Amino acid sequence: MPFIDSFCGKICDECEEKNNKQCGGCMASNGSSSLEACEIAECAKAKGKRFCGECEHIPCDIITRYAYDQERGDNGARIIRCKEQKARLVQEARVGVNPVSFCGHHCDFCFYAEWCGGCRSSYNCCSFATLFDGSTCPNVRCANGKNLKGCYECADLYDCDKGYYGRVNEYIAKATALFIKKHGEDCYTMTLKRAIEAGEDYPKTFDASGSVASALAILEGYIQP
């Protein structure tokens, strides 16, 4: 799939404006074509998104209005195209990448997996990371600084409150890191998969347990010899 050549997902080569040589394309002109200013282009640029598919709010009111406009709309085709392109970017970024994140979260089972390639990938869109400078999670920065594969290799893990480990009422990240430290990554992946198949809601069930120790105990309850 070629990369989308417009912010909204419309195919430029099929656009009547480009065919009439009135427009060079919104991406080619950075949203400043010879036509009227485009609010979609301005919105995407303001949010630092290459196209609407990278925005967590798709389909928003703006793109929906354009997609279903009676004169220039395409009955929502551009929205579907944006989502397909986003999915392709995530899929390509995750090829050959370890799905176990630095903090212990598992990207294969993360609710954000359809939007993010993972913190080890070249397409890291982690919503937590965006809260920090350079969109780099403190756990990732610290582990890389110590040349560690992940927080689970750190001697300071038990008392650490950096990044995810300092979030109130969220225990799953440290619990899974402790699990990996004790049992290894392969056991973690198989055990978490088993827990989810048994009906555990990852990460909600574990966070609702009330503590790191309780979350860890739930996960360890699914270990098989």
Give the role of each language-model region.
Residues 1-225:
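Cysteine-centered metal-binding/redox modules
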